[in-house]
Amino acid sequence: MSTQQTHLKQLEAESIQIMREVAAEFENPVMLYSVGKDSSVLLHLARKAFYPGKIPFPLLHVDTNWKFKEMIEFRDRMAKQYGFDLIVHKNPRGLEMNISPFTHGSAKHTDIMKTEGLKQALDMHGFDAAFGGARRDEEKSRAKERVYSFRDSKHRWDPKNQRPELWNIYNGKVDKGESIRVFPLSNWTELDIWQYIYLENIEIPSLYLAEPRPVVKRDGTLIMVDDERMELEPGEAVEQKMVRFRTLGCYPLTGAVESQATTLPEIIQEMLLCTTSERQGRVIDNDSAGSMEKKKMEGYF
C-alpha cells in the first residue's frame, strides 16, 4: 500500500468515526448535501460508515432556485440510486420576493436563500446536529473552526467561544434549541478529496471536468450561461471556452476556470501545480473583508 493510500485511509477512518459518534450521540442529525465534490465524498463515507444498513439520517439540500441544472439532476439521481432520505427546502419568503442574484445582489441572495433557508429547515425539522463538507484548507474562517462547531439557538457561530478539542475527543453537549455543525472533512485538503474520489471511483457532477461551455466574462470571473435567466450587461458577449469548476454553487455566483482537465488524473495533476484557492471563483466570498466569517456568524454553512 502506498503512503498516499495510507494517508487517505487514515482520513477516511477519522471521518467515519466522527459520523458514527454523531449518529450515536445526537437525537436528530442531518447531513447537508450541496451536491458538490465534498458532499459526494461525505455521502460515500456515510454509506461506508453504516454499511450494510441504511444511512440513519436524512440528507438536506437547501435549494436557492439558482443552482446549475446539472446539480439538481445529479441530486435527484443520487437519491434514487442510493435510496437515502432527501429533504429539499426552498425559502418560501425568498420565492415570494423573487430573490435573484442579479437584481438583489450576491449578499442579499445568499443571506435569504441560503442562510435563512438553512435555518428554516433546521428549525422546521428540529435537527440538533448537521454534517457539512467544509474543510480547513478552503478559507481562513473555516481554518479556525472546530470539527464540532457549536451554534446557539439562533444558529450563530462565535469564533471566540469555541470548545477545545483534544485528540479525537469532542464535546457534543447542547441545550434545547442549540445545535452542532459537524465537519468530518476538516483535515482533508482539496487534493485529498480528488485523490479519494479517484481511488474510490466516486461519481461527481461533470461540471468539475473541462469541456466547451458558454461563458460570460464579468469582473474578471467567467460565469457560465446555464439558462435563459442569465442577464447580460452592456458590452458583454457569450463565448465558448474550455472550462471547468473547482467549486459549485449558484451559477451566477460561481466562476469557472479555464482548463484542459477532462479526466480525474488530469484534475489531480492540475491540483499539484495550482497555487490559488478553489474558492477564488465564489463571488460571495468577495462581498467584503471577512465576508465568510460574518456569514458563518449569522448561521451560514
From Swiss-Prot:
Enzyme Commission code: 2.7.7.4
Keyword hit for Transferase: yes
Top-level taxon in the UniProt lineage: Bacteria
InterPro entries: PAPS_reduct_dom, Rossmann-like_a/b/a_fold, SO4_adenylTrfase_ssu, Sulfate_adenylyltrnsfr_sub2
Reactions catalysed, as given in the entry: sulfate + ATP + H(+) = adenosine 5'-phosphosulfate + diphosphate
GO function terms (MF aspect): ATP binding; sulfate adenylyltransferase (ATP) activity
Protein keywords: ATP-binding, Nucleotide-binding, Nucleotidyltransferase, Transferase
Coiled-coil region list: none
Pathway where this protein functions: Sulfur metabolism; hydrogen sulfide biosynthesis; sulfite from sulfate: step 1/3
One Pfam family of this chain: PAPS_reduct
Class in the EC hierarchy, top level: transferase
Family matches, as Gene3D superfamilies: HUPs (3.40.50.620)
GO biological process: hydrogen sulfide biosynthetic process; sulfate assimilation
Record function comment: With CysN forms the ATP sulfurylase (ATPS) that catalyzes the adenylation of sulfate producing adenosine 5'-phosphosulfate (APS) and diphosphate, the first enzymatic step in sulfur assimilation pathway. APS synthesis involves the formation of a high-energy phosphoric-sulfuric acid anhydride bond driven by GTP hydrolysis by CysN coupled to ATP hydrolysis by CysD.
NCBIfam families: CysD, PRK05253.1, PRK12563.1
Family (UniProt): Belongs to the PAPS reductase family. CysD subfamily.
Assembly, per entry: Heterodimer composed of CysD, the smaller subunit, and CysN.
Protein name: Sulfate adenylyltransferase subunit 2
Organism field: Shewanella loihica (strain ATCC BAA-1088 / PV-4)
High-level lineage: Bacteria, Pseudomonadati, Pseudomonadota, Gammaproteobacteria, Alteromonadales
